[in-house]
């Protein structure tokens, strides 16, 4: 007697922790559907159709570019597995619509809002206080700088010909840590962030011997490095969106990219890993003559190898808890912290 197969439950496809999932997908010119109980994407090869399996239980996010379609059944299975689905333009560039001219990625959260509110409660406890929000932004920037040197000097990059002396990267990180700690407001912090990124581009160009380079925003760049930077950034946005969803943090509660910018917290979260992983790989791939698929594979492997999603989640958790604790301290003992932002930045509490 053959027993009936049990229906697939959402709990059955979430056995792999979100932070440990290995796959990020960017798909173009294909259809995503359910075939034989599996989520697959279909591509056309002449008169033939090729079906490719998507291991949804080990996937954190999927970006759908131009020429894609998604069936209701596939979306239902992706939701059960807790996979974030984002819609963007070709090559990971921004979307454009008649009502809003700069929509980076439109995200569909995978399931209901019945998630733990621990980190959301901690986040909103400090978010309405300008000084505390600045402190959180500084902590985010400092952790980004702490993580960067090890990634830029990894063995994988050295083997690919991207050999940057640790002392050089460490000195750059130390210089900007001082700038972050002393920034009086968010505007100054954003200015320092732009200077850091520009300095990293310069260092990457010198290391690779890339030649003349000017960063073009919004997908307008025509050279390989610019295209790869745009493309890679959207993979990082996928991780940022996944991390904020896991922790139950709304995308609008940004600490760095503006209180009124839609999806700002996703950009904050992605900033933790963009410079460290995407920038060097973009120039390595550009010099090597990789196509977009090869570059994408290298980026995903680097993000997985460095446990980038784990890192983003851990830092957002730490920011939420640490800054909420400072909020509680200032409520119970006004004036107890002389410089909240500086105290948070260096992990110390200065008494008045």
Where are these regions (language model features)?
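Active-site helix-to-loop segments that bind/position phosphate- or nucleotide-bearing substrates
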Residues: 2-30, 37, 42, 80, ...
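A positional/architectural concept
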Residues: 7, 14-16, 32-63, 71
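Glycine/small-residue-rich interface belts in oligomeric ring/scaffold proteins
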Residues: 52-120
């Amino acid at each position: 007697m053959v027993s009936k197969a049990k229906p697939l439950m959402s709990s059955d496809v979430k056995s792999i922790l979100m932070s440990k999932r290995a796959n990020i997908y960017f798909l173009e010119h294909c259809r995503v559907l359910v075939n034989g109980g599996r989520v697959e994407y279909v591509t056309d090869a002449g008169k033939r159709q090729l079906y490719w399996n998507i291991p949804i239980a080990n996937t954190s996010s999927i970006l759908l570019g131009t020429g894609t379609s998604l069936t209701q059944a596939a979306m239902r299975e992706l939701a059960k597995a807790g996979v974030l689905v984002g819609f963007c333009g070709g090559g990971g560039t921004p979307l454009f619509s008649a009502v809003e001219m700069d929509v980076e990625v439109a995200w569909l959260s995978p399931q209901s809002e019945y998630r733990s509110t621990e980190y959301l409660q901690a986040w909103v406890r400090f978010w309405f206080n300008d000084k505390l929000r600045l402190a959180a932004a500084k902590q985010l920037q400092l952790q980004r700088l702490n993580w960067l040197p090890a990634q830029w000097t990894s063995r994988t990059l050295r083997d690919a010909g991207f050999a940057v002396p640790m002392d050089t990267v460490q000195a750059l990180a130390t210089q900007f840590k001082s700038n972050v700690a002393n920034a009086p407001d968010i505007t100054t912090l954003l200015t320092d962030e732009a200077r850091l990124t520009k300095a990293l581009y310069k260092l990457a160009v010198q290391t690779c011997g890339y030649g003349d380079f000017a960063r073009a925003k919004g997908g307008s760049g025509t050279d390989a490095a610019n295209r790869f930077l745009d493309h890679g950034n959207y993979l990082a946005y996928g991780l940022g969106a996944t991390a904020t969803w896991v922790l139950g943090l709304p995308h609008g509660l940004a600490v760095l990219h503006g209180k009124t910018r839609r999806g700002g917290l996703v950009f904050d979260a992605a900033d933790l890993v963009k410079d460290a992983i995407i920038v060097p790989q973009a120039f390595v791939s550009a010099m090597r003559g990789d196509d977009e698929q090869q570059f994408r594979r290298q980026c995903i492997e680097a993000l997985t190898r460095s446990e980038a999603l784990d890192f983003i989640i851990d830092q957002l958790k730490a920011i939420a808890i640490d800054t909420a604790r400072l909020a509680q301290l200032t409520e119970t003992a006004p004036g107890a912290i002389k410089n909240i932002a500086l105290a948070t930045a260096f992990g110390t509490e200065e008494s008045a």
